[in-house]
């Protein structure tokens, strides 16, 4: 299966390093947009391993990154017809209001062109509130074919009740998702 990534990277050594890593993973870089602006920067996050009983923690430093400035007019129009499955995470929607708007428009355009929409409800409380996340992702669900959502996110952020099987079946019944995958942490 040929896969590609849609992203925007700074036009500098760091951006080229990331592009080369993408290529090394046998992922097409045809849809990488390069940011030539003086403000160009790569978004990063820092991971600190936890030591029991303290959990691991993540610090996101993605504000004002090149990716956050991605706009629809930077993408070739043929991308929508060429794509069979478009996968996106809710983290993308949480990074920046303008990027959220762009990502939602991309979901609609891929859906209209006949692509399957694969969506990972990867909720991160450090990026946005449960209320905003719930409102945003529930508006996207009607377009989603393949849904990835944890039991914890379903119960807490999305306020679903019932057995895990009932909750997952509810996504299919309510929104028409054809495949729902979940994780259960013990």
Model-identified regions with their sequence ranges:
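Active-site beta-loop-alpha junctions enriched in small/polar residues
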Residues: 63, 91, 122-126, 152, ...
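Conserved N-terminal subdomain of the carbohydrate kinase-like
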Residues: 5-90
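Histidine-anchored nucleotide/phosphate-binding helix
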Residues: 1, 103-109
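Conserved phosphate/ATP/ADP-binding segment of small-molecule kinases
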Residues: 113, 127-186
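Anion (oxyanion) recognition and catalysis
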Residues: 23, 108-112, 141
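Glycine/threonine-rich flexible loop motifs
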Residues: 92-101, 129, 157-160
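Structural motif
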Residues: 85-87, 118, 148, 181
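Short beta-strand/loop segments at the ligand-binding rim of alpha/beta enzyme cores
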Residues: 113-121
């Amino acid at each position: 299966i040929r896969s590609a990534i849609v992203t925007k990277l700074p036009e500098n050594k760091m951006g080229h390093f990331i592009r080369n890593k993408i290529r090394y993973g046998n992922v097409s870089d045809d849809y990488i947009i390069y940011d030539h602006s003086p403000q160009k920067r790569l978004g990063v996050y820092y991971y600190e391993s936890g030591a029991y009983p303290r959990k691991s923690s993540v610090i996101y430093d993605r504000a004002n990154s090149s990716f956050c400035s991605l706009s629809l007019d930077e993408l070739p129009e043929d991308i929508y017809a060429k794509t069979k499955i478009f996968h996106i995470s809710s983290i993308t929607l949480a990074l920046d209001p303008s990027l959220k708007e762009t990502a939602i428009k991309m979901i609609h355009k891929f859906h209209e062109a006949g692509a399957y929409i694969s969506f990972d409800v990867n909720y991160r409380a450090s990026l946005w509130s449960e209320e905003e996340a719930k409102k945003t992702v529930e508006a996207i669900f009607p377009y989603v074919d393949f849904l990835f959502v944890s039991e914890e996110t379903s119960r807490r952020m999305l306020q679903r009740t019932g057995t895990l099987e009932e909750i997952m079946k509810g996504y299919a019944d309510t929104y028409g998702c054809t495949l729902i995958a979940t994780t259960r942490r013990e």
